[in-house]
Amino acid sequence: MQKATYCDGSAIYSGLPYQSANGLGYDASQQQYLQALHAESEYHRPACSLQSPGISAGLHTSNEMSEVCQQINGTQATVTDTSDNKQPPTAPSGPSSPSSLNQIPNIDSAAKNPVHVSPTPSTRKHIFPWMKESRQNTKQKSCSIISVESCAGDKSPPGSAASKRARTAYTSAQLVELEKEFHFNRYLCRPRRVEMANLLNLTERQIKIWFQNRRMKYKKDQKGLGMMPSPGAQSPHSPVSLSSGGGGGGGSAYLSSMHSLVNSVTYDSPSPASYNKPQSNTYSLPTSYPPLNNCPPPQKRYQGTGTATPEYDTHHIQGNNNYGTQVQGSPVYVSGGGGYSDSLVGMGASVFGLTHLPHPSQGNIDYNGAITMGNSHQQGACDSNPCTFTDLTPHYSQGRIQEAPKLTHL
């Protein structure tokens, strides 16, 4: 770093005027001019830097030359180029006077001897004030950054030493308010979180983290108790409740009974029986139904295939006793006939909602194809005439209805 390390040759050879090769010479009277220039510009490069290598080769180092200049003059002498006409003096390229050449070794020896030189104000000026300020500013900035990181422990990066957060200790009042809020709403919106933070003197981040931890604890507790319902579906552990009404049952009972009957029945006839459609006047139905108290209803006669007298078995009628309450009132599908026959064991009218249909529950059953209603069906003064039902279905096969298994998959 060459800052003001050279000094003028006239400062060294102040009492020895000499004539240079180009006609310019130094004299002792030039020191006043140099001092005036030194007062104007102190930090410019000196005129010694313009010397030729002939004289500068005799000097060892610039530091030693600066120390010699400080001993002789005490101040740094600098020469600037004022104009092109006034050229600064340069050292002679040719051989100079013998006296000046003889003093160069003496200068070298004098430069080697004073190694330890007390610092002068000129040497102290090498460290400028702005340099000290910059170093202090950098130290202050680094200290301020460290202090900010240490103070704001929550916002520090995870790798730094100040990243370890202190465990937040909530007071009992804060915990009560947080638990109360969690009881009503497990997820807080931001306006409510800001309100809670202002109310409890906490930060939004602390409240958000508390709610996250509380939700995880709630889920863990629910899983431990086995009470967490699967979303959008019913839990497989909870049983399916079948609502059975008193005597008939509900719609679910009807579905389960029908499902069990369909699965248990075996079909051996590939095609259903063919029915001969009677004429339109075969069915003589009354157009009006008078009330039962006034007059007896007319005799209703259903004529089907006429001479076909199907054979009945009491087997499938007694098999209904093995079914539950839901199955007793359900119609029995008999193979081969392609139709349903009402079971006579239980009254299942409420299962199907067919309360308007007559059920021969108290009638006498004739297994030759006719069901005759007895006198026990009378209400008030009304005498019920026997209704003859000629069945439309052909021969029923024996023992086709088996006991239906209980369903567990519904």
Curated annotation (Swiss-Prot):
Residues 163-222 bind DNA. Its main location: nucleus. CDD domains: homeodomain. Disulfide bonds: none annotated. Keywords: Developmental protein, DNA-binding, Homeobox, Nucleus, Transcription, Transcription regulation. Gene3D superfamilies: Homeodomain-like (1.10.10.60). It holds the Pfam family Homeodomain. It is found in: Nucleus. A motif (Antp-type hexapeptide) lies at residues 127-132. Sequence-specific transcription factor which is part of a developmental regulatory system that provides cells with specific positional identities on the anterior-posterior axis. This is Homeobox protein Hox-A3a. It comes from Danio rerio. The lineage of its organism: Eukaryota, Metazoa, Chordata, Craniata, Vertebrata.
